[in-house]
């Protein structure tokens, strides 16, 4: 569609044509001017830039704001608007294209100068990362530098901890196996309860001491069983009676006459019968003493012994020693270190046999 132009609009078109005919070294010859767009668009794009911009060099980005170049942009915009089907959409898109073109030219002209002075964004990011601590991370996915080291340290520590646990487990297994072997060797008195480690060591010590005592006997371990406690007391009284020559000698003589006058009685089973030669009396002969016939002598001999010890301090103190030895031979109740008494952990086989 052809549109009629007013006289004022025609004059402006002619001025634009004169500007295009002027020779410009940095532009190619332009085609003939297209028909002028409507007056509304020209009114909007009236040159508002100062004329001093036309004196700038072509390399300066501000030279694109000069009126001559603005005329070229206006003519191209008018040609584009004439061939566009929708005027409203083209009017809105034309200023955007101009702004985009100017921005690209400004970036191209200023890119060469600024690239040599300022480093790129990647270099700036690397420098900042080095200042922060040394971990460089790119958008494309760079590997970290400190994370693998921490993982390696954790792995080494875990391996060391597992190795230490395995060594401790093997040590405890070996110790328990050794205690089991020791429990099988020492006597347990048919006790269903499993002995603790402390009780096992204590029983082993007692058992070893008993075996060493058996080996130190002169008969090679074939010593007779010890007499009962009643026989031991009779031996003690007979020793004390034999040490005196006074009233004790008269009592032994009377006992000897009674034994020779009567028939000899058999020894009951389980009793103690010990015969030994007493020292010579005033008559000059020795007799065999029977301990079973001196039931009334025990109290008198003990009284005489205590009286003699009180009267004569020079009497040796070994007379009362056998009594103390008999009391000490009974197995005392030793207590465990933890305060708990174990009846089976303080006696040996020799004590049971006696």
UniProtKB/Swiss-Prot annotation:
Residues 1-55, 91-122, 216-277, 312-354 are annotated as: Disordered. Residues 26-38 have a biased composition (Pro residues). SMART domains: HLH. It comes from the Eukaryota. GO terms for cellular component: chromatin; nucleus. The keyword Nucleotidyltransferase does not apply. Keywords: Activator, Deafness, Developmental protein, Differentiation, DNA-binding, Neurogenesis, Non-syndromic deafness, Nucleus, Transcription, Transcription regulation. It is found in: Nucleus. Pfam families: HLH (PF00010). One of its GO terms (molecular function) is sequence-specific double-stranded DNA binding. Residues 1-21, 94-107, 335-354 have a biased composition (Basic and acidic residues). Residues 159-211 form the bHLH domain. Disulfide bonds: none annotated. GO terms for biological process: auditory receptor cell fate determination; auditory receptor cell fate specification; axon development; axon guidance; central nervous system development; central nervous system neuron differentiation; cerebral cortex development; epithelial cell apoptotic process. The keyword Ion transport does not apply. Residues 108-122, 250-264 have a biased composition (Low complexity). Transcriptional regulator. Activates E box-dependent transcription in collaboration with TCF3/E47, but the activity is completely antagonized by the negative regulator of neurogenesis HES1. Plays a role in the differentiation of subsets of neural cells by activating E box-dependent transcription. Efficient DNA binding requires dimerization with another bHLH protein. It is linked to Deafness, autosomal dominant, 89: An autosomal dominant form of non-syndromic deafness characterized by progressive hearing loss, with onset at birth or early childhood. This is Transcription factor ATOH1. The lineage of its organism: Eukaryota, Metazoa, Chordata, Craniata, Vertebrata. The gene is ATOH1.
């Amino acid at each position: 569609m052809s549109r009629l132009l007013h006289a004022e609009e025609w004059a402006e078109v002619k001025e634009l044509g004169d500007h295009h005919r002027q020779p410009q070294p940095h532009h190619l010859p332009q085609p003939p001017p297209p028909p002028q767009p409507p007056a509304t668009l020209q009114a909007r794009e009236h040159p508002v830039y100062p004329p001093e911009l036309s004196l700038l060099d072509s390399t300066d980005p501000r030279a694109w704001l000069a009126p001559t170049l603005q005329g070229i942009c206006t003519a191209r915009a008018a040609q584009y608007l004439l061939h566009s089907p929708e005027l409203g959409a083209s009017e809105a898109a034309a200023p955007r294209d101009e702004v985009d073109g100017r921005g690209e030219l400004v970036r191209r002209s200023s890119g060469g100068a600024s690239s040599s002075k300022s480093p790129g964004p990647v270099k700036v990011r690397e420098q900042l990362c080095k200042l922060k601590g040394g971990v460089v991370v790119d958008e494309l996915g760079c590997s970290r530098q400190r994370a693998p080291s921490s993982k390696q340290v954790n792995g080494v520590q875990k391996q060391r901890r597992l190795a230490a646990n395995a060594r401790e487990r093997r040590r405890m297994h070996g110790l328990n196996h050794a205690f089991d072997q020791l429990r099988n060797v020492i006597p347990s008195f048919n006790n269903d309860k499993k002995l603790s480690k402390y009780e096992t060591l204590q029983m082993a010590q007692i058992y070893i001491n008993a075996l060493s005592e058996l080996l130190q006997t002169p008969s090679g371990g074939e010593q007779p069983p010890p007499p009962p406690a009643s026989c031991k007391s009779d031996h003690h009284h007979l020793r004390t009676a034999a040490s005196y020559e006074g009233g004790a000698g008269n009592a032994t003589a009377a006992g000897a006459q009674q034994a020779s006058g009567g028939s000899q009685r058999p020894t009951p089973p389980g009793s103690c019968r010990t015969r030994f030669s007493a020292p010579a009396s005033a008559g000059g002969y020795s007799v065999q003493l029977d301990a079973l016939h001196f039931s009334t002598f025990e109290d008198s001999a003990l009284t005489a012994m205590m009286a003699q010890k009180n009267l004569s301090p020079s009497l040796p103190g070994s007379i009362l020693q056998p009594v103390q030895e008999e009391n000490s031979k009974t197995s005392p109740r030793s207590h465990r270190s933890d305060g708990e008494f174990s009846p089976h952990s303080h006696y040996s086989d020799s004590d049971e046999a006696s």
